[in-house]
Amino acid sequence: MIHHVTLETRREDVDDAVAFWALLGFERVEPPSERLASIAVWVQRAGTQVHLLFHDAPVAPARGHTAVVAEEYDDAVARLERAGFECRPSTQDWGSPRCSVVSPGGHRVEVMAFPPNA
C-alpha cells in the first residue's frame, strides 16, 4: 500500500487543489506537526494521503501521474466535469473505465473505476 504522494503546488493554488481532491473523495487533514503544516497541506481518503507541498515554481512531470480508484467512477467524472475539469478517456487496457484530468497546479491524475487484477 502506498501511504502518500507529494505534489508541488503554489500556496495560492492550495484551496483549488484541495477542492479538486475533494471531488475524488479526499478530505483535508492536519499534518502531525506545525513544521509540516507550514510547508504543506494534506488530504486523505481511506488511509492514502496526498501532500500538497508549497513551492513557488512547482514541477508537474509531463508524463508522470498519480492514479486513484474512484469507486463511484461515473459520479466522480461527473463531479469533475461539473467543476470545469476536462476528463480525457483512456484505453480500457484491463476493462476498467479510466480518464486523465489535470489538477490545479498542472499535475495529471488518472481516475479509474477499478485497478488491474481487481
Residues covered by each model-derived region:
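N-terminal beta-strand motif that seeds the catalytic metal site of vicinal oxygen chelate
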Residues: 1-18, 64-66, 117-118
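Core segments of cupin and vicinal oxygen chelate
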Residues: 8-49
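Structural preference for long, well-ordered alpha-helical segments within the folded cores
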Residues: 19-23, 79, 105
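Vicinal oxygen chelate
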Residues: 31, 83-118
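Mid-chain, well-packed structural core segment of small domains
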Residues: 63-85
